[in-house]
């Protein structure tokens, strides 16, 4: 992929993160990226996610915490408006 594409896609991710959570920084963007990809895989290939969750229960717990944090931040942002 070209550097230009990577920069443009990063801009999209940054704006999405800001709109979703009310703030955007490198850590938040990484969290949103993992959350979005995990959610997409869970919807399109649930057996793969089930297997991953069973194989890596500690990672599953981290993902559950990440999802909870993103949901909380999004709700806080919506309540501010």
Regions found by a protein language model. Give the residues of each.
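N-terminal acidic leader/helix
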Residues: 2-32
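Charged, amphipathic alpha-helical oligomerization/scaffolding segments
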Residues: 8-11, 15, 40, 65, ...
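Charged/polar positions within long, soluble alpha-helices
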Residues: 18-21, 46-54, 75, 79
